[in-house]
């Protein structure tokens, strides 16, 4: 079996909306890489999605990926809600446009290129890798605040 790539992702926002950042700690075996960035005007959910997108975009080949996020929004969106959104033309069950549909569609396309599983971790609870992703996201936000 392939050694999986772990992506520990997080988003941060100073105000919601406001300056925001995203962070990714990538781990493949004993190797690690850190990624982060931000935007001047965004939301926490957009940064959570962007973190996963940027992590997946950095992969150079198809692989097994375990995405560890503290965002129920991202995890539930990809595991539960997205199927209905796609079936309904990117509308919610209430027939409203899906928020952040641009990012959801990009994430959906990227996930399709890999063997992906999702793990939820409790945020701000001492999970070392999640704390590092949070620090990276805050560094990304600090560039714009």
UniProtKB/Swiss-Prot annotation:
CDD domains the UniProt entry points to: RNase_HI_prokaryote_like (cd09278)
Pfam families according to UniProt: RNase_H
Gene Ontology BP term (one): DNA replication, removal of RNA primer
GO cellular component: cytoplasm
Cofactor descriptive note: Binds 1 Mg(2+) ion per subunit. May bind a second metal ion at a regulatory site, or after substrate binding.
One Gene Ontology molecular-function label: nucleic acid binding
Cofactor(s), names only, from the UniProt record: Mg(2+)
Gene3D superfamilies: Ribonuclease H-like superfamily/Ribonuclease H (3.30.420.10)
Domain RNase H type-1: residue ranges: 1-142
Record's keyword terms, sorted: Cytoplasm, Endonuclease, Hydrolase, Magnesium, Metal-binding, Nuclease
Amino-acid positions noted as binding Mg(2+) 1 in the UniProt annotation, renumbered to this chain: 10, 48, 70
Residues given in the record as Mg(2+) 2 binding sites: 10, 134
Compartments where found: Cytoplasm
Record's keyword annotation contains Lipid metabolism: no
Reactions catalysed according to its record: Endonucleolytic cleavage to 5'-phosphomonoester
Domain of life: Bacteria
Assembly, per entry: Monomer.
PANTHER family for the chain: RIBONUCLEASE H1
Function text: Endonuclease that specifically degrades the RNA of RNA-DNA hybrids.
Similarity comment text for this entry: Belongs to the RNase H family.
Descriptive protein name: Ribonuclease H
Gene name tied to this protein: rnhA
